């Protein structure tokens, strides 16, 4: 396979593909195409077919050379990975042998100042992975102080969330907050960081990005969809980069692999048959060499499971993942919904 696009090595890419164990003739779903690193590794590992999804139109356009070099074995689809079951069916592959997902914003998106993901370079306060729905600037402009504080606390795990929200509300009364630098400066004025710690705006930017893109709900829906499309013996590999994502994946696999049953007195408490076997009792993390080459890998965790022959569970059978059911966007509707 040959292509002109620079080679991209994804975080924990070799480990994720080893976990998937691609085989000749197998069909694999890359739920987060990005720069194409996982898709490329799967295509190189065996004579496979890969269906790759990304909601970012620029990522799909950037994959043209890889598609050309794959000899008809790679199909790119612009969509959300929560719709992966529908995508697979539309591509004539209602059941697949493996699913890989790399959760969160890509390095490619962070490096583009005009996408508004990074506080390290100035750009419009956008943060959308696609082209639909409200931007981060919309949320910052319209959310109430309470809603904004809850967003930052729940999705950013920022202990100074109320201070940040108060500062944002005060600042927007003076002038609209429309750039990443403007927001980062506001956050830095109330959140102090010691030398060697993360940038003061890190958690606030994470929270807004997750909220704007509905990332946690998307992740859970994608996991449930993967459960439906994986063949018995098919494998799921998920790379996460922060505790909220990892908690969802860990809980999903734990719930889906749990063995239990009701008693003759309370048969209604019987546990559904396990739909997964956990392959990673502890998450796989990046080694020193990978972290040195790519600092983003420091927080990465890889978890995986193998599909059993049991029916898929109901998609609402995962308690306790973080949501904002009680938080309305004060005039800002959820992206694309």
UniProtKB/Swiss-Prot annotation:
Any one of the GO BP annotations: rRNA base methylation
Quote the InterPro entries the UniProt record gives.
RsmH (IPR002903), SAM-dep_MeTrfase_MraW_recog (IPR023397), SAM-dependent_MTases_sf (IPR029063)
Keyword hit for S-adenosyl-L-methionine:
yes
Chief location of this protein?
A: cytoplasm
Provide GO CC annotations from the record. cytoplasm
Q: Which UniProt keywords apply?
A: Cytoplasm, Methyltransferase, rRNA processing, S-adenosyl-L-methionine, Transferase
Q: Which Gene3D superfamilies match?
A: Putative methyltransferase TM0872, insert domain, Vaccinia Virus protein VP39
Record GO terms (molecular function): rRNA (cytosine-N4-)-methyltransferase activity
Which EC numbers characterise this protein's activity in its record? 2.1.1.199
Which of the seven top EC classes does this enzyme belong to?
transferase
Q: Is the keyword Methyltransferase assigned to this protein?
A: yes
User: Which segments carry the region annotation Disordered?
Assistant: 295-323
Spell out the Pfam families in the cross-references.
Methyltransf_5
Family, according to the entry, reads as follows: Belongs to the methyltransferase superfamily. RsmH family.
Protein function = Specifically methylates the N4 position of cytidine in position 1402 (C1402) of 16S rRNA.
Q: Protein name, please?
A: Ribosomal RNA small subunit methyltransferase H
């Amino acid at each position: 396979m040959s292509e002109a696009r620079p080679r991209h090595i994804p975080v924990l890419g070799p480990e994720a593909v080893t976990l998937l164990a691609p085989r000749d003739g197998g069909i694999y779903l890359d739920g987060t195409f990005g720069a194409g690193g996982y898709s490329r590794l799967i295509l190189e590992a065996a004579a496979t077919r890969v269906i790759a999804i990304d909601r970012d139109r620029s990522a799909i356009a950037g994959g043209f050379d890889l598609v050309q070099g794959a000899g008809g074995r790679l199909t790119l689809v612009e969509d959300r990975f929560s719709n992966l079951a529908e995508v697979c069916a539309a591509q004539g592959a209602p059941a697949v042998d493996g699913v890989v997902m790399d959760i969160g914003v890509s390095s490619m998106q962070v490096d583009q100042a005009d996408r508004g993901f990074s506080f390290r370079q100035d750009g419009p306060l956008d943060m959308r992975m696609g082209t639909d729905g409200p931007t981060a600037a919309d949320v910052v402009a319209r959310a109430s102080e309470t809603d904004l504080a809850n967003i930052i606390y729940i999705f950013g795990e920022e202990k100074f969330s109320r201070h940040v929200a108060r500062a944002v509300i005060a600042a927007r009364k003076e002038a609209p907050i429309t750039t990443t630098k403007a927001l980062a400066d506001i956050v830095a004025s109330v959140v102090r960081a010691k030398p060697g710690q993360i940038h003061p705006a890190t958690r606030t930017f994470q929270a807004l990005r997750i909220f704007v893109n509905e990332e946690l709900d998307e992740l859970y829906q994608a996991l449930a969809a993967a459960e439906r499309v994986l063949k018995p013996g098919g494998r799921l590999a998920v790379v996460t980069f922060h505790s909220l994502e990892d908690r969802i994946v860990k809980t999903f696999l734990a719930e889906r692999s749990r063995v239990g049953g009701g008693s003759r007195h309370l048969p209604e408490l019987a546990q559904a048959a396990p739909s997964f076997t956990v392959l990673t009792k502890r998450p796989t993390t990046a080694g020193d060499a990978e972290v040195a080459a790519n600092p983003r890998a420091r927080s990465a965790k890889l978890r995986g499971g193998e599909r059993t022959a049991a029916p898929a569970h109901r998609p609402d059978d995962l308690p306790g993942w973080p949501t904002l059911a009680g938080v309305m966007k004060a005039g800002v509707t959820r992206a694309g919904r």
